[in-house]
């Protein structure tokens, strides 16, 4: 499950809903679900959660982590895009977005382009982590996800952002903003 959060950059927050194509893992102890919140500008994963339940709570936890990490300063202009998954159209989720000053936006039915970045992250996660071995527990998936998110953010080179890692793309953005502020 990919959540794409952008708070300070292009002012766009995208979220992907839970569907059978989202990262879920068959572990020895049952299914495990994974949620990601991704900055759409730098493609940095800024929130994530692993859960044994597909209830809205774990999706809210991933969103809260992203909001805590990003601390959006602008009210208005930030859009949270999601598909029509039950978690994202729930009253609690929508209410939390509005409390944070984020405009909810729901994608059209069956339009894979609405969630292309989320699907890309899901595919990478499945190929690079989930399909590589059998999983015994949610805890094992959580530890592997933690390690992968750190690697993805700080070492994975992404062509759409100049063949640099997401954390470096952010650092360059802020350095450029600081240079502009000094010149002004």
Regions found by a protein language model. Give the residues of each.
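Charged DNA-binding/catalytic regions of mobile-element recombinases
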Residues: 21-184
